[in-house]
């Protein structure tokens, strides 16, 4: 089609065709109207990489650092480059729409998807979102900013009612979306599951029409989160353009036609309005086909798995890393120290959080591998303590045939798919699908096959392989399912997940609790493993995740006390040691929130024992949101490494060895303990609602207002060099603020980057205001001794307004203000006062 004319096509569509465009046809595709040349459009997760169209057996992809890590770069140019790379990844999957970035707020540290979003600060979150969206859409790929709005916890997320003041809604939770619309104009926005002040977001006229469409003049497409549509008429009338996934539940021809024919429900104009926005999204895709080369329903490939991709992922991961402590400049060295490695995350490939952010990565470099790569030789290692939430690893540690070499081709398990359960199969029944499984966490809810009815995905999987222990000892096997499962070892049933099921956290909270069995195994002996799995409809639990999924695991049992002693002995034996600890994609995941800020299991005991044995041990933490460090005063060197994507291990090694001078800054405040955080009393859905009791005082706004100390403040991060900052010029007009800041690298050894952070304070406001608020930042790279001037231009109304609930408008108060420039919210190096002579009121962008 040479010209995709939205209005012309709208006029030519019949009613049934229009209705069909109001919902997806499956998990990842919109409806094709062949008669009019309207193509199907493929969408794909997600926030830190492009999975493609399969949770199960998906084509590998590049994995980026998680959202809080990306925002900790404080680098708009780098984030735009990351968005461009995400677009290239999307093109390799023939997906025209990326379901990201995630732009919700961290009210507190426990949110299951807190790692996915950028920041506790709405300005940083909004500008990070804008940069990533610009990168994506500049390459012709549509972005989807999500989840609109107040989707800030997982507890009862489909029904939870977020009770939030109008001022907090505007200043904190809507603000990142407003900034994204203003600066990047995303093609799509995804609505949230939850309610806000009584109305489901996916059918809220106030949010979708009054604010997004009328006030902000946004003209993109609104899609639901998956299974996040709750009505037919209200959602159509109030602005939700398309329901995901398909097949539709709420927008069948019968339901929509009934609503059209019922008095005071919806009109043909309402349907046309929704279809028009879907067509505008498709127009964006079609108009960019020459640039993207995307093929409708085309194959998915790993063509973007290149050295250039790896190098950029490594750069992004390294620049996200935050140096938290470096007492006596212990890490300020470029020598090739032979670090000996300890810790549960050292050999784990903790590349991302869980849920929609998880994916089958091209590869993942573990921290241990990164250090070995840097040194060119193996180093001593011990685990010290386990930190898993549940046991995985069966597929990763099994062989298809133990008699053959243990290479990549022979690694994993064979999965055979059948229409009947094993006890009902005839001897000659052949599987309708056979594949190899390399990952133990298997999600099948988007599995498609001609033999499987998508509305009732009833099938069975036989999983087989061989496990060969590397040591004598006790081993723990595990199984959890959404569906049903039986785990056999040498044809003996060891775990039953078919009968007497108990609900647990698996499969977004729809599946079972983990069940385990400890067995004594012999080194080198071949053990036949078999799992008989029945798909989602066979589950004894009520849930709605289609074909479901399963996770089978095995791990060597350890004596915790003995392992901690081993770790301390290793640390004491060597001058240089690094301890890699943290969370993973089970502790931080979509579907549920963390219960506390604790490091898992006996991690803290491990850290204390190692630090006592060797105080110079470098601690590296991996998490997407804060954890408690009860041993903080004892640590001399501490690094926050987030979930670093494919290149996490190489990036960590680059920072430890001084090849990259750390330049990340914390995208959220780091409290000492859970009870300190602003949402402590209100981070749970109770009686169907969650009260945003901290109001506008989120993150550092709260800590500063209460003068409550934190372990590490917002915007904080050390370097291997030092900097000076000073405001050299400052001008205020009726609508602009211009700030010039001189920045000097005062070190003589390392080039490095510093982030100039600009905060504003209202000194005599008539309403309660934060002590200060971030409204500008700029990253600058300097050679030793070099000085540069950074110029930052801001709109006056964006810098100092608050939302006046009484008037329903933004309000710039006449009065006195303070601009503060520093390297964190707690390290202000230069200030200037200024005055605004008259009040200003405004709405919109």
From Swiss-Prot:
Catalytic activity: Hydrolysis of terminal, non-reducing beta-D-glucosyl residues with release of beta-D-glucose
Annotated PANTHER family: BETA-GLUCOSIDASE, BETA-GLUCOSIDASE-RELATED
EC code: 3.2.1.21
Species assigned in the record: Kluyveromyces marxianus
Catalytic EC class: hydrolase
Pathway assigned to this chain's UniProt record: Glycan metabolism; cellulose degradation
Protein keywords: Carbohydrate metabolism, Cellulose degradation, Glycoprotein, Glycosidase, Hydrolase, Polysaccharide degradation, Signal
Active site: 225
GO biological process, one term: cellulose catabolic process
Taxon lineage: Eukaryota, Fungi, Dikarya, Ascomycota, Saccharomycotina
Name recorded for this polypeptide: Beta-glucosidase
Glycosylation: residue positions: 66, 304, 438, 621
Subunit structure: Homotetramer.
A single GO molecular function term of this UniProt record: beta-glucosidase activity
Domain PA14 residue range list: 408-568
Sequence similarity: Belongs to the glycosyl hydrolase 3 family.
